[in-house]
Amino acid sequence: MDHLPMPKFGPLAGLRVVFSGIEIAGPFAGQMFAEWGAEVIWIENVAWADTIRVQPNYPQLSRRNLHALSLNIFKDEGREAFLKLMETTDIFIEASKGPAFARRGITDEVLWQHNPKLVIAHLSGFGQYGTEEYTNLPAYNTIAQAFSGYLIQNGDVDQPMPAFPYTADYFSGLTATTAALAALHKVRETGKGESIDIAMYEVMLRMGQYFMMDYFNGGEMCPRMSKGKDPYYAGCGLYKCADGYIVMELVGITQIEECFKDIGLAHLLSTPEIPEGTQLIHRIECPYGPLVEEKLDAWLAAHTIAEVKERFAELNIACAKVLTVPELESNPQYVARESITQWQTMDGRTCKGPNIMPKFKNNPGQIWRGMPSHGMDTAAILKNIGYSENDIQELVSKGLAKVED
């Protein structure tokens, strides 16, 4: 297979990934592959572009490094072109409502007829099968959080609250990435393709599993947090200092001992309620939990963030200032690791945003291209799989493909 023009880099160089999906979840998987060196083809509808394009800045991050193909993959010669593309594809990711592709005739079996080694990742809100009441429903971030039991655990004691920005989409996209790579590893051993069914609500069910285990195995459900503090453990969560907010985790034997000395509770150490060797203070079960919070609140309120960070570093207590977005760029850790970077858009502008993660030492990722325009690479991709100029123009004339104007 001849690859499309692009630099060779990263741990996934030589891999061809194709995705069909809009907005965030499915495309986030494609973004990860593209930043790690894979050749990633982004399929868009011919009649209307991905709705993410209406956003002024985010698409320049989420669609960088991609090749843009505008093709009607469900109709006539457009479908034939799509299946031809699948013959040279390693991983295909689609994000839709339930078994939407199967309903329109593109089943796993059809895809495997054209490429027996193909890894297929289906990403939907409620999965490829189940009850009709749910399977075909649309789903976005908040829907997946609400249905999974994740949302009800977040917020404050007075009201649940979804986690933003778009947590379920990103977790689901990352799940698609890792699952597809796991499947590809097996395919290269057996020569037999794989189909993966990723339900967003099940992804979030796993993300919310920590507190749920107490309910499933004991009938007790952890209460929601109060003012950003951990619902279980004192000294953990969000706290206010004299000049702003920090988060901290009071965990560890020596950490508790030294902190208690600072906040005036040394006399509680080695008591029946806080015996020697205590590593966590349970805010509900320990009768001194509320007192610990009261004393800690008072001590933190009397000190600046800088003073708290310095003292907690001496005590090996994990803590961090709650940074504002403007503070990120100048933070020395961000600067040292180049966590924020710049790249050129296709129209020559400079765009700034998060850099590639994680950092591969021997085969690093890179940003080699900004977001392509609608249909920008259609002709190049179709030529790559054997279509002539006349073939491409015929697809365009029938409204089955769009090329860049």
Swiss-Prot record:
Major place of residence = cytoplasm
Tell me one GO biological process term.
Answer: carnitine metabolic process
Among InterPro entries, the record links this protein to: CoA-transferase_III (IPR050509), CoA-Trfase_CaiB (IPR023452), CoA-Trfase_fam_III (IPR003673), CoA-Trfase_III_dom3_sf (IPR044855), CoA-Trfase_III_dom_1_sf (IPR023606)
Record keyword Transferase present: yes
Tell where it localizes: Cytoplasm
- EC annotation from Swiss-Prot or TrEMBL: 2.8.3.21
Q: Which residues bind CoA?
A: K97, R104
Q: Give the record's GO CC terms.
A: cytoplasm
- What pathway does the UniProt record associate with this protein? Amine and polyamine metabolism; carnitine metabolism
Q: A Pfam family in this protein?
A: CoA_transf_3
Looking at the record's lineage, which domain of life comes first? Bacteria
Report the protein's function: Catalyzes the reversible transfer of the CoA moiety from gamma-butyrobetainyl-CoA to L-carnitine to generate L-carnitinyl-CoA and gamma-butyrobetaine. Is also able to catalyze the reversible transfer of the CoA moiety from gamma-butyrobetainyl-CoA or L-carnitinyl-CoA to crotonobetaine to generate crotonobetainyl-CoA.
**Protein name as annotated:** L-carnitine CoA-transferase
Query: Whose protein is this, by species?
Result: Escherichia coli (strain SE11)
Q: Which gene is transcribed and translated to give this protein? A: caiB
